[in-house]
């Protein structure tokens, strides 16, 4: 029995293990999952200190530690040195944003899906490609790392972002998420820690959860990682690297300053940490800033997918890989994919080589300007965050709305 009385002691969570069977740490994990689902434990709740909870439950501290560690691996908890342990802010959020078409009358705004106006150009090029005498080869296996011409196309694609590399440092992946998951799996081990922005892309969370990698929120100022925050995480959290989206960050839509890009590159070199830079939206910005990779190419894995800029179904991404990571990442991509689709890779490379990709990107940017003008006019008088050229805009809700009530009203209105 616990030495201390907790009858009138305020605790954010008082689980009941009296009916638990089997290992107590697993029972505690199960109770936490249930309490999160039923709303007893809400997102953002700070949990009691582990020693305090162990005393309350009359169990060994190691039981609580094992339970919290497993909950962290499941994506339920987030902990940092000196700040305690919290229920993850997005623990109840839907991780799969793409939906089917069961309700065609519902306007889908959950996932960031590019407009389809450029698809006719992709279709036209694909039709010409399939009429070539060697078109049957596009349905066979191909070079797992991409052909020389495809990797040269990757070099040309990166140059559009102001980043110069060599084809020997370019790998191909089956889209940005595939590239990101491969990079995490190849270069980090289960239990390793990766620094991210406090608000970050849901896809890195699902990949990290799959691989048992812990995401550590880095201190931000004006939506950008601070030097102090990165140094603290390296020293105290022992992070192995950081993940960043410098351009039209998902979900904040912030564009990282040139000063911060250079600071991250300098710290990566000084501390010998990995930087995974997601450049998926770089070419949609009006005046693209140089990627972090351009300042520290030997420390940065630079991912650039064609999904948001050319076509969502063109599952191709180019990956800049420094020498020190090349063999490991190439092997992981092979293990995951065997080979990327020769057809999609050939279409992607061809669109870049003949200038069609540039035409589609110009159309995308013009469409974004038109859409942003519409939303600015339609919601005049309301506070709209994010740049007026962004693929995402944020509406600051009036006081009479909560996020949940707005979501319900929007769904009733068909959104």
Which positions does each model-derived feature cover?
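N-terminal basic, amphipathic alpha-helical segments
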Residues: 1-130, 139, 150, 330, ...
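Conserved core of the PLP fold type I
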Residues: 138-271, 282-301
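Hydrophobic residues in beta-strands of the RecA-like P-loop NTPase core, especially within AAA+ ATPase
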Residues: 196, 276-277
């Amino acid at each position: 029995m616990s030495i201390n009385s907790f009858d009138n002691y305020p605790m954010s969570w008082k689980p009941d293990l009296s009916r638990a069977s089997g290992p107590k740490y697993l029972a505690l994990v199960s109770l936490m999952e249930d309490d999160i689902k039923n709303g007893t434990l809400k997102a953002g709740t700070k949990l009691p200190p582990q020693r305090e909870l162990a005393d309350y439950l009359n169990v060994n501290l190691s039981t609580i530690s094992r339970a919290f560690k497993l909950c962290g691996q499941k994506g339920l908890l987030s902990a940092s040195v000196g700040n305690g342990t919290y229920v993850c802010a997005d623990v109840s959020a839907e991780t799969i944003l793409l939906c089917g078409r069961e309700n065609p009358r519902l306007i889908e705004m959950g996932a960031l899906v590019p407009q389809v106006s450029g698809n006719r150009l992709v279709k036209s090029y694909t039709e010409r490609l399939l009429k070539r005498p060697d078109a049957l080869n596009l349905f066979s296996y191909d070079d797992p790392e991409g052909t020389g011409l495809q990797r040269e196309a990757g070099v040309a694609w990166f140059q559009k972002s102001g980043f110069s590399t060599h084809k020997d440092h370019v790998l191909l992946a089956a889209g940005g998420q595939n590239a990101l998951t491969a990079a995490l799996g190849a270069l980090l081990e289960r239990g390793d820690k990766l620094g991210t922005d406090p608000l970050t892309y849901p896809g890195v969370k699902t990949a990290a959860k799959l691989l048992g990698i812990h995401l550590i929120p880095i201190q931000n100022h004006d939506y950008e990682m601070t030097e102090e925050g990165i140094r603290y995480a390296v020293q105290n959290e022992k992070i192995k690297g950081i993940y960043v989206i410098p351009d039209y960050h998902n979900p904040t839509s912030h564009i990282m300053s040139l000063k911060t890009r250079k600071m991250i590159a300098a710290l990566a070199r000084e501390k010998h940490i990995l930087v995974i830079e997601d450049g998926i939206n770089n070419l949609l910005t009006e005046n693209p800033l140089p990627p972090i990779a351009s300042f520290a190419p030997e420390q940065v894995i630079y991912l650039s997918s064609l999904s948001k800029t050319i076509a969502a179904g063109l599952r191709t991404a180019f990956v800049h890989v420094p020498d020190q990571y090349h063999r490991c990442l190439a092997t992981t991509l092979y293990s995951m994919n065997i080979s990327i689709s020769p057809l999609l890779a050939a279409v992607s490379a061809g669109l870049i080589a003949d200038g069609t990709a540039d035409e589609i990107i110009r159309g995308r940017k013009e469409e974004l300007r038109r859409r942003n003008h519409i939303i600015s006019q339609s919601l005049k008088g309301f506070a709209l965050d994010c740049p007026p050229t962004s693929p995402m805009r944020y509406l600051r809700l009036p006081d009479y709305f909560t996020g949940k009530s707005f979501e319900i009203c929007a769904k009733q209105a068909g959104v």
